[in-house]
């Protein structure tokens, strides 16, 4: 009897301590990889990676363009990648995937959510009906001699990766959603991309990689979770856009969607940085490599590193 009471009491204490630890964990995003920043101890390079911490969850979003640089920045920022709830790879481009090699040396079993691509980096096979067949050809001119396997297996540079393909909006943890999209732009036509949306009491926290499906489309998808967007953080892919489009996007995000804050990075583009700064003023959050963006609440970011 006393033993059972003691076990129940111990279980209650463990739950209380776990809840307290989660409550004390800061809600924040640490920028691990980008091509602009303030810290001399970090290496700038084209690409994107961020550690998202919210509600006790630790989520790696993208892994940068160079595994060695990713490793350097992670170590300089004293970030522990062995203790992750999961990782998200926004899309297949190398400036978001190259650090997977380093991640898997530290955390080989980590779940990695990826776009549901029919072929390519994440070893997804494709049925043999994707190509037309011509039985009139001799066998030596036909693929697989005219007898292809039912599934053509894709290759991957990370054969041990625990990749989980996502093809529809998925709630991967309470209040944490992965939003898939598809690019319709000529240069990246049909490219699949994932964004991360977290429902907070102050609105949606929206993390994006490159916004190839279009930042307006991604924001619109996020408003299905909550019409109020607390913050939009990441690459908005305006680097090649003319001034009129740059200004239009800034106005749409501020006036139409009424985002509370923006923290642009990566492929957003310098002219778009300037346009968003003009539109959002004090609600523009600097998010260069090494920055720590508080979630949700504070509209300022600090630079992480030794002594911080």
What are these regions (language model features)?
Residues 111, 195, 201-293:
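Cap/insert and terminal regions of metallo-dependent hydrolase folds
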Residues 9-18:
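Bacterial N-terminal signal peptides
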Residues 1-10:
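Bacterial N-terminal signal peptides that target proteins for export
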Residues 28-77, 189-207:
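Conserved beta-strand hairpin/beta-sheet module of binuclear metal-dependent hydrolase folds
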Residues 68-113, 117, 223-233, 237:
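Active-site metal-binding motif and surrounding structural segment of the metallo-beta-lactamase
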Residues 38-39, 67-69, 93-98, 119-122, ...:
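Active-site environment of divalent metal-dependent phosphoester hydrolases
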Residues 52, 62, 74, 91, ...:
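Divalent metal-coordination and catalytic microenvironments
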Residues 118-194, 285-302:
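Metallo-beta-lactamase
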């Amino acid at each position: 009897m006393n033993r059972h009471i003691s076990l129940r009491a111990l279980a209650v204490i463990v739950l209380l301590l776990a809840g307290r630890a989660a409550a004390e964990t800061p809600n924040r995003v640490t920028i691990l990889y980008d091509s602009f920043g303030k810290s001399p101890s970090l290496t700038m390079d084209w690409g994107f990676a961020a550690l998202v911490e919210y509600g006790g969850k630790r989520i790696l979003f993208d892994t940068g363009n160079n595994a060695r640089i990713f490793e350097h920045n992670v170590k300089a920022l004293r970030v522990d990648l062995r203790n992750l709830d999961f990782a998200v790879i926004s899309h297949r481009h190398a400036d978001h995937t190259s650090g997977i090699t380093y991640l898997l040396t530290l955390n080989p079993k980590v779940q990695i959510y990826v776009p549901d691509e029919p072929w390519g980096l994440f070893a997804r096979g494709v049925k043999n009906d994707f190509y037309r067949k011509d039985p009139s050809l001799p066998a030596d001119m036909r693929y697989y001699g005219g007898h292809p396997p039912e599934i053509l297996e894709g290759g991957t540079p990370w054969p041990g990766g625990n990749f989980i393909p996502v093809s529809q909006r998925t709630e991967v943890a309470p209040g944490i959603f992965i939003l898939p999209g598809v690019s319709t732009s000529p240069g990246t036509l049909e490219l699949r991309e994932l964004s991360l949306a977290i429902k907070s009491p102050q609105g949606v926290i929206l993390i994006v990689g490159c916004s190839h499906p279009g930042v307006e489309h991604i924001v619109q998808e996020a408003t299905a979770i909550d019409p109020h967007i607390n913050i939009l953080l990441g690459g908005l892919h305006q680097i090649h856009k003319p001034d009129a489009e740059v200004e239009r996007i800034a106005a749409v995000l501020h006036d139409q969607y009424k985002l509370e804050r923006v923290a642009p990075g990566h492929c957003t583009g310098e002219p778009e940085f300037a346009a968003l700064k003009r539109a959002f003023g004090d609600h523009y959050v600097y998010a260069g490599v090494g920055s720590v963006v508080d979630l949700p609440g504070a509209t300022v970011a600090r630079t992480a590193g030794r002594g911080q």
